[in-house]
């Protein structure tokens, strides 16, 4: 038991000090502003209110500690227009500053971990698409899978207590606790009995939520390693925006003989495979359903008795992987059996051999994606393209560039799809919606405006992959078509856009 306790206390022993004055530094909000500009990859970013300054933050924190923080004088409202805003505005300013500050100790911890283990190019480990090669490699050999929704009902005090393990600064923790209690109603929304964070203030709460889930995953990964067929000799945990488990060594050195200089290696076969992103986790194994049920109740008890979160066992279903589809990160992933018949001839006798190969498939679900396009006014609910309202001062090139950027971002993200038919339909919707938007602006028919644009306009909606392949294989169309239909996983995608994030 002492060995287990030491495992759990290993990383907690490194507490970092918060510098409380960081809340009043201008560059903290400059970093938050820079993050806001890079966050959106689909639409024109509305920007972050760059008028926020350390003076405003000082006034807000002072008023938070007062008995009536929302009572402002008339002079303040005239001299400073920010105090005429609603309560959400104040919470956004402080939460952005908090988010930048609380990430500093974890960033230092990550850098020191990478330097200690001599791991380079860690940015590729942060890519969302890095999960799919793992699924592609492992899931075709597994039998059972559980799609688990992690409970969101987390008390405020639990979030603060979790952060105390990593931060040794009472002033910042007290301010964080006061801030959460004061602005809780404006920072979360209740939907279908599940607490979700408001889109206006996601960064701080996603960090607090991930730090809370990190505690749970320490326990889970420890139990997982203990139950592996061969224990892991080396492992690394990377705590970032996208947190996942990274195995450094894939083989276990079992035997070494100095005389013959021979090394015997066994491939490590973990008992349970675990993937988590956002509020969903996936557990997969090739063992019997009975063992999967045991792990199911382990998770329920761990959540309820250690993390004080109510978890219904009925929400965890155990399914056969070959008969189940996972809706994960904008893809519908499944493992399908591809039957093949081989004719074998042996002397005068011939017989047929039926083989079934497992293949991991990733398909773009068209119905939810059309729903997202419909909400963004690119098409109606049936998928028919419509014109999108634009500002009168928008130029034609700006409108075309905007539609091209959306189309290429979607093509870039869904490049790992096994079948491109759904993706072609989405590109068709965006292309025709762009034409209708331009025709509406110039008060002309779609046919007339399309003739004016010509075929070059349609070629602009080709992705970079299609253009490159057409240049490499100009005459062998079948070869380029086959290559483009293949899956391509990009390791530079670190955020999921709004149209894909329809779950």
From Swiss-Prot:
It is found in: Plastid, Chloroplast. One of its GO terms (biological process) is tRNA processing. This is Maturase K. InterPro entries: Domain_X, Maturase_MatK, Maturase_MatK_N. It comes from Eucalyptus globulus subsp. globulus. Belongs to the intron maturase 2 family. MatK subfamily. One of its GO terms (cellular component) is chloroplast. Usually encoded in the trnK tRNA gene intron. Probably assists in splicing its own and other chloroplast group II introns. GO terms for molecular function: RNA binding. It comes from the Eukaryota. Pfam families: Intron_maturas2 (PF01348), MatK_N (PF01824). Keywords: Chloroplast, mRNA processing, Plastid, RNA-binding, tRNA processing.
């Amino acid at each position: 038991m002492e060995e287990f306790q030491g495992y759990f206390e290993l990383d907690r022993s490194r507490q970092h000090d918060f510098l409380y004055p960081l809340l009043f530094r201008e560059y903290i909000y400059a970093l938050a502003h820079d993050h806001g500009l890079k966050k959106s990859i689909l639409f024109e970013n509305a920007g972050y209110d760059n008028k926020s300054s350390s003076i405003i933050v000082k006034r807000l924190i002072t008023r938070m500690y007062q008995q009536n923080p929302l009572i402002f004088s008339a002079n303040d409202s005239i001299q400073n227009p920010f105090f005429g805003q609603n309560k959400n505005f104040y919470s956004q300013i402080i939460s952005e500053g908090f988010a930048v500050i609380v990430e500093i100790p974890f960033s230092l911890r990550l850098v020191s971990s990478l330097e200690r283990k001599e791991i380079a190019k860690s940015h590729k480990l942060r890519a969302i698409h890095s999960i799919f090669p793992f699924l592609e490699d492992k899931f075709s050999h597994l039998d059972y899978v559980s799609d688990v929704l992690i409970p969101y009902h987390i008390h405020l005090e639990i979030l603060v207590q979790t952060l105390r393990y990593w931060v040794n600064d009472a002033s910042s923790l007290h301010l964080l606790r006061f801030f959460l209690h004061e602005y809780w109603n404006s920072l979360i929304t209740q939907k279908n009995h599940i607490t979700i964070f408001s889109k206006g203030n996601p960064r701080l709460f996603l960090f607090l939520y991930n730090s809370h889930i990190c505690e749970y995953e320490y326990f889970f990964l420890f139990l997982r390693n203990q139950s592996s067929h061969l224990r892991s000799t080396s492992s690394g945990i990377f705590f970032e925006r996208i947190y996942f488990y990274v195995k450094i060594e894939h083989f276990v050195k079992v035997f070494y003989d100095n005389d013959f200089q021979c090394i015997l290696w066994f491939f490590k076969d973990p008992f349970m495979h675990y993937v988590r992103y956002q509020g969903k986790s996936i557990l997969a194994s090739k063992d019997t359903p009975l063992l999967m049920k045991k792990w199911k109740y382990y998770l329920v008890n761990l959540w309820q008795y250690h993390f004080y979160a109510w978890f219904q066992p009925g929400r965890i279903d155990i399914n056969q992987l070959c008969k189940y589809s996972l809706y994960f990160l904008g893809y519908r992933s499944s493992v399908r059996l591809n039957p093949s018949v081989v004719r074998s001839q042996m002397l005068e006798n011939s017989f047929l051999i039926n083989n079934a190969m497992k293949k991991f498939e990733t398909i773009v679900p068209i119905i939810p994606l059309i729903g997202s396009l419909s909400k963004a006014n690119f098409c109606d609910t049936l998928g028919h393209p419509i014109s999108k309202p634009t500002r009168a001062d928008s130029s034609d090139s700006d409108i075309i560039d905007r539609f091209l950027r959306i189309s290429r971002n979607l093509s870039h993200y869904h490049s790992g799809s096994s079948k491109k038919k759904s993706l072609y339909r989405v590109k068709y919707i965006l292309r025709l919606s762009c034409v209708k938007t331009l025709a509406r602006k110039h008060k002309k028919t779609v046919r007339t405006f399309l003739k004016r644009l010509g075929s070059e306009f349609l070629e602009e909606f080709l992705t970079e992959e299609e253009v490159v392949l057409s240049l490499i294989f100009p005459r062998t169309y079948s070869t380029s078509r086959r290559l483009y239909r293949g899956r391509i996983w990009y390791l530079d995608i670190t955020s999921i856009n709004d149209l894909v994030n329809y779950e």
